[in-house]
C-alpha cells in the first residue's frame, strides 16, 4: 500500500460553507464553485411516479417541477429541522449531499 505525499493529500481537501435555509440552501467551496438550490426534496409517490420522473430522488427546482408526482418535503423551518421526523432528517441529508455534489471537481 502506497501513501500519498502530504502535499498531494492537502491539495485534495476542499473546504465548504453550507447555509441551509428554509426556502433556499447555498454552498461555497474553496475550489471557487458556488451554488444554491431551492430547499425541497421529493421522493416519487409510487412506482408509476418513479417511471414518470425517472429518478428515485429529486432536489430543488427538479422537485418543484414534478411536485404532483412526489412526496415533497421542505425539511427546514427557521434554520432548524422542521419536525424532527426520520423523513425530515433524511431530506436534510439528501439536500446536503446534493449541494456537495454541485461543487465537487469532476475527475
Could you describe each region identified by the protein language model?
Residues 1-13:
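Conserved phosphate-binding catalytic cores of ATP/NTP-utilizing and phosphoryl-transfer enzymes
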Amino acid at each position: 500500500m502506497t501513501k500519498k505525499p502530504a502535499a498531494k493529500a492537502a491539495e485534495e481537501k476542499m473546504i465548504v460553507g453550507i447555509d441551509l435555509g428554509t426556502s433556499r440552501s447555498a454552498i461555497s467551496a474553496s475550489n471557487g464553485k458556488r451554488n444554491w438550490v431551492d430547499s425541497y426534496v421529493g421522493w416519487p409517490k409510487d412506482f408509476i411516479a418513479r417511471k414518470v420522473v425517472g429518478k428515485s430522488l429529486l432536489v430543488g427546482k427538479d422537485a418543484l417541477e414534478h411536485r404532483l408526482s412526489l412526496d415533497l418535503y421542505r425539511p427546514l423551518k427557521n434554520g432548524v429541522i422542521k419536525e424532527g421526523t426520520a423523513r425530515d432528517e433524511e431530506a436534510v441529508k439528501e439536500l446536503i449531499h446534493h449541494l456537495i455534489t454541485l461543487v465537487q471537481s469532476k475527475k
